[in-house]
Amino acid sequence: MKHPIHVTSEIGELQTVLLKRPGKEVENLTPDYLQQLLFDDIPYLPIIQKEHDYFAQTLRNRGVEVLYLEKLAAEALVDKKLREEFVDRILKEGQADVNVAHQTLKEYLLSFSNEELIQKIMGGVRKNEIETSKKTHLYELMEDHYPFYLDPMPNLYFTRDPAASVGDGLTINKMREPARRRESLFMEYIIKYHPRFSSHNVPIWLDRDYKFPIEGGDELILNEETIAIGVSARTSAKAIERLAKNLFSRQNKIKKVLAIEIPKCRAFMHLDTVFTMVDYDKFTIHPAIQGPKGNMNIYILEKGPDEETLKITHSTSLMEALKEVLGLSELVLIPCGGGDVIASAREQWNDGSNTLAIAPGVVVTYDRNYVSNTLLREHGIEVIEVLSSELSRGRGGPRCMSMPIVRKDI
């Protein structure tokens, strides 16, 4: 394997992808803690698993190798000291409940096999799982209704966000919300210690220790020379600027970064919830991210005279900026919901714009977004629909649920 990670476009034939099958973490959601854990509803586990399995099999049927985050993470932690280090970091970053000794929780987690350990960390540790010593301190006697020593990680099935493949390397991301911060730790250990990746010296363009947040749902690889990144509710302009500087100084293929400003709200969480590439010259878009005349704030970042200086050009037309960086005379923006104010809002809420391209002009979408799917077909796109009644409750679509590891060049 020459490069274990290789992604130079959004639409090149997908060869290898990383998924996470929803597990116990979804069942550990309760109404009282939905907002804290970034959910609006509680998926029904048996059905969301069936839908996710259908999604994975749909990809396999098209020749895609499907990897699972939970399996790779377990395979990476073969060394005893490595397991202990990983658990220590998970507990520290998860701010595991201070009323239980760190060591007690650590010993409990390390008593499991690797596979069970990963599932337990992802699923969360309930307070009634661990026998603690007799309560002798006042703080221990205080009634505490919070049910977890270690919070569940229900957003993990959105593998797109904690890390993103960019060329032959990747970003391992600092997530904005505390509920998701630990997620990128899995990818850090997989890249460093899993035999599939560890011997290849995979470049890390930006790591999770950088102080400003960036998330993979905002990172779109337009072509070998250009990436687009959303300035969003979850991704900071400062992180984009740092990533651009790192890319320009450490490699010579990517020459432009488009910073696309989108409204900062939950409905438009990441750039890929409102804008995705479906063919060489076709994109889906949610019309509400544009002003009355189609105006937006787009900044084209290019290498400056030195490593710490960027050339920044402002544009107010997404169409014109895309045509410039892609070298196209014409392109098509396909509106989510057909531009109808009700259909577009409804289908965008259920990720109508969040398509996963598995080849040029071939996309995977949620079946429930029938207006958008019909419009895509009318524009010559092959649309492969997957079941979505429970998957969509997490507010993420097929692109959100997948991290491409290898794509063919276009």
From Swiss-Prot:
Entry EC no(s): 3.5.3.6
Gene Ontology annotations of biological process type: arginine catabolic process to ornithine; arginine deiminase pathway
Keywords linked to the UniProt accession: Arginine metabolism, Cytoplasm, Hydrolase
An annotated GO cellular component: cytoplasm
Catalyzed chemical reaction(s): L-arginine + H2O = L-citrulline + NH4(+)
Active site: 400
Subcellular location: Cytoplasm
First-level EC class: hydrolase
Family named by the database record: Belongs to the arginine deiminase family.
PANTHER family: ARGININE DEIMINASE
Protein name (database record): Arginine deiminase
Organism for this UniProt entry: Bacillus thuringiensis (strain Al Hakam)
Lineage of the species this protein comes from: Bacteria, Bacillati, Bacillota, Bacilli, Bacillales
